[in-house]
């Protein structure tokens, strides 16, 4: 991925339109998790340090193309000000004459947070008019929003047609780490694919079968594979229309010499709660009236063993319903195995896996936590990311 970065251009005295990913959780008008804001700090601090006038653009939530008061970026700007230790100004719109007036008052090194770009219907449609209106505000475009790189929107892709366009440090690191994992991995290379649905992970499983030494399956999608082996799955999540596909994946893994691991035992429950009665059974003995909601003890140990003997592990998707403690042990076992495997480079593919390592207090022991769930998945599938394609080549 040879794209220009902020270090390849001169930004002193220039107005920089920097697309960041400030789509953070909020409660009662306060930011409850500032991880994504912190992740953008190196780029913002570099730009201010170089004497740029920095405009920060982001989406927040899904306002559906109209102004939604509780989705304004004001609390985000406030939190950013605390983290940066300098005044952060806030605009009430994302473009237009009022914003231009605010920009003309900026000094070198100042920061102005623009309003939620998804307040405008043209953002998600990648409308050229809106892209141009954004571009008219600035001299340079920087994209540091890896989490939105798989979207062809006005502020992530369209704007790049009208300005010099480069990546920020976060975007650059994501592309380097994930790019190496896909094109030149250290071996043994293990991928762990969890989550609820096979249909969401078809592309990534297909792509990884050509690259990995071990492919570990967990989460709700595992039961379609269990069914493909000829076992009944009780009330567990099952995609009947994907059973043949699951079988073909296992056959293809065998042909390629890939070690394809699915659970050998599972935790079954009579209720979707912490008070449920649970027991651990082999996959051949899942009772018809119960639901499997996590991997079993034997499976946990087997998976941990594979992890410890790997040089590179990419993890995307939990092993069970980890939000409920009764069904979190499998996911926790994976996180702990990664934390303990000191010679293993661990890449956590955003989304639920990132939330899980946070929940278990193990985030700082992972080598790289991706800031983009959907984007990292599409990147690993080998798809082009519009937000990356739009940037200038070196």
UniProtKB/Swiss-Prot annotation:
Its EC number is 2.7.2.3. Keywords: ATP-binding, Cytoplasm, Glycolysis, Kinase, Nucleotide-binding, Phosphoprotein, Transferase. InterPro entries: Phosphoglycerate_kinase (IPR001576), Phosphoglycerate_kinase_CS (IPR015911), Phosphoglycerate_kinase_N (IPR015824), Phosphoglycerate_kinase_sf (IPR036043). The modification Phosphoserine is found at residue 183. It comes from the Bacteria. Coiled coil: none annotated. The modification Phosphothreonine is found at residue 299. It is found in: Cytoplasm. The keyword ATP-binding applies. Substrate binds at residues 21-23, 36, 59-62, 118, 151. ATP binds at residues 201, 323, 350-353. GO terms for biological process: gluconeogenesis; glycolytic process. GO terms for molecular function: ADP binding; ATP binding; phosphoglycerate kinase activity. It is an enzyme of class 2 (transferase). The keyword Nucleotide-binding applies. Gene3D superfamilies: Phosphoglycerate kinase, N-terminal domain. It catalyses: (2R)-3-phosphoglycerate + ATP = (2R)-3-phospho-glyceroyl phosphate + ADP. Pathway: Carbohydrate degradation; glycolysis; pyruvate from D-glyceraldehyde 3-phosphate: step 2/5. Belongs to the phosphoglycerate kinase family. HAMAP family: Phosphoglyc_kinase (MF_00145). Monomer. This is Phosphoglycerate kinase. It comes from Bacillus pumilus (strain SAFR-032). The lineage of its organism: Bacteria, Bacillati, Bacillota, Bacilli, Bacillales.
């Amino acid at each position: 991925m040879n794209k220009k970065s902020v270090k390849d251009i001169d930004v002193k005295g220039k107005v920089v339109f920097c697309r960041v990913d400030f789509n953070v959780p909020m409660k009662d008008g306060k930011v409850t998790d500032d991880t994504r804001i912190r992740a953008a700090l190196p780029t913002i601090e570099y730009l201010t340090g170089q004497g740029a006038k920095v405009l920060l653009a982001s989406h927040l939530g899904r306002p559906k193309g109209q102004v939604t008061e509780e989705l304004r970026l004001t609390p985000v700007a406030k939190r950013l000000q605390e983290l940066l230790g300098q005044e952060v100004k806030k605009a009430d719109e994302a473009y237009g004459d009022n914003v231009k007036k605010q920009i003309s008052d900026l000094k070198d090194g100042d920061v102005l947070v623009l309003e939620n770009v998804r307040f405008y219907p043209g953002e998600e449609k990648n409308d050229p008019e809106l892209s141009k209106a954004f571009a008219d505000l600035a001299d340079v475009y920087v994209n540091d929003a890896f989490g939105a790189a798989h979207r062809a929107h006005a502020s992530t892709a369209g704007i790049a047609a009208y300005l010099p366009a480069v990546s920020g440090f976060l975007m650059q690191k994501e592309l380097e780490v994930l790019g190496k994992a896909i094109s030149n991995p250290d071996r043994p290379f293990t991928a762990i694919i969890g989550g609820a649905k096979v249909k969401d992970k078809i592309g990534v499983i297909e792509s990884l079968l050509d690259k990995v030494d071990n492919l570990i399956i967990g989460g709700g999608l595992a039961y379609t594979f269990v069914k493909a082996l000829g076992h009944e799955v009780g009330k567990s999540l099952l995609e009947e229309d994907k059973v043949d596909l699951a079988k073909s994946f296992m056959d293809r893994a065998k042909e390629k010499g890939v070690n394809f691991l699915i659970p050998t035992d599972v935790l079954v429950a009579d209720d979707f709660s912490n008070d449920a009665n649970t027991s651990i059974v082999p996959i051949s003995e899942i009772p018809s009236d119960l639901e499997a909601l996590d991997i079993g003890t034997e499976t946990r140990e087997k998976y941990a063993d594979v992890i410890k003997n790997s040089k590179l592990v990419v993890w995307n998707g939990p092993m069970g319903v980890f939000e409920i403690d009764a069904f979190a042990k499998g996911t926790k076992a994976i996180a702990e195995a990664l934390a303990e495997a000191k010679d293993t480079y661990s890449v956590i593919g955003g989304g639920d896996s990132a939330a899980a390592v946070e929940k278990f207090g193990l985030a700082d022991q992972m080598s790289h936590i991706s800031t983009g769930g959907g984007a990292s998945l599409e990147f690993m599938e080998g798809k082009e990311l519009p937000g990356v394609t739009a940037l200038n080549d070196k």
